[in-house]
C-alpha cells in the first residue's frame, strides 16, 4: 500500500504544473457542508475506499505492473479534474472528471482510490475542495462517477455497442452523474427548513448550461483515449478485462472519426476566449456551489494550506516537472516501447 500511495500521490502532482491560478472546477469547498452531513458522506465513502485498497492489493499481487498503472491513472484523473475549460455559452469554467476512463481501465473500486488521492492533493495544495468535504467530493466524483461510467460501459458492450460508442456514453454519464450527486449533497446539506426537491432541481438547472456540453466533451475524450489504447496496446486492454482477447476491434472506423470530430468541434467552441481579454470566467464552484451555499448561510472557509503565500506553489511546480518527466516516460514506454515488444512476439 505504501508503494501505491507514493506512485499515485507523486504522479498526481503533475497536474499542478498546468495551473497558473486557482482551479475553476466543481468541488464542495471547505466549510460549506454542516459537520453532520460532512461526516455522513465520509461514512458513505469509507467502505468503497477500503474495498478499493483491497482490490489494488489483490491485483498487484498477480501483476507487478498494476501499481505503476494506477499511479499513471491518478495523474490522468488529477490533471483532467483540475483543467479549467471555459464554456462561452454559460460564461463559466468547469472541468471534466476523468473517472469514466479510470473506471473503464482499472475498475470502479480502484478508481475510487485514485480519485481520493487526487482530491486530497487538490484540497491540500490547490484550494480545490476541502478536507471536511473530502468525503462528499469522493462520493460524487469517485463513487458515483466511477460506477456510473463502469456500469454503462459494461452494459453497452454486452448489448453489442462498439468500443468507441460505449466509452463515449460512459464518459458522458460519468460526468453527469458526478454533478447530479453534487446537487444531491449540496441541497441536502444547506437546505435547512427549505423543501429538498425544489432546491435540488434549482442546483441541477444551474449546472446544466456548463456541464451539458462538457459532459459531451468528456465522452468524446474518453472514447478517444480508449480507442487509442486499443489500437496501440490491445493486449493491455485484454489483460485489464476491457476487451476480450482476440475479440472484435474498436468498432467501425467511422465511429472513431465521428468521436474525434465531435471532440475537436466542442473543444474549439469551449476554449474560444471571450472578446474582452479582461473578462473573468468564474468557476462553477463560485457560480453554483458557493452561491447556493451563501444563499443558505454557508460560507466557504480558507484552505488549510494557502499556496498564494511564500514559495510553496513554486516548489509544487518544480516537483511537478520532475515527476511529470518520469510519468511521461512511463506512458511512452507503455504505449510505444512495449508495443514493439508485443508486436515482435505476435
Swiss-Prot record:
The chain crosses the membrane at residues 31-51, 68-88, 101-121, 133-153, 159-179, 196-216, 255-275, 312-332. InterPro entries: CbiM (IPR018024), CbiM/NikMN (IPR002751). Its main location: membrane. Disulfide bonds: none annotated. It comes from Geobacter sulfurreducens (strain ATCC 51573 / DSM 12127 / PCA). This is Cobalt transport protein CbiM. HAMAP family: CbiM. The keyword Flavoprotein does not apply. Pathway: Cofactor biosynthesis; adenosylcobalamin biosynthesis. PANTHER family: COBALT TRANSPORT PROTEIN CBIM, PTHR43627. It holds the Pfam family CbiM. GO terms for biological process: cobalamin biosynthetic process. One of its GO terms (cellular component) is ATP-binding cassette (ABC) transporter complex. Keywords: Cell inner membrane, Cell membrane, Cobalamin biosynthesis, Cobalt, Cobalt transport, Ion transport, Membrane, Signal, Transmembrane, Transmembrane helix, Transport. Belongs to the CbiM family. The keyword Lipoprotein does not apply. Residues 1-25 form the signal peptide. It is found in: Cell inner membrane. It is a multi-pass membrane protein.
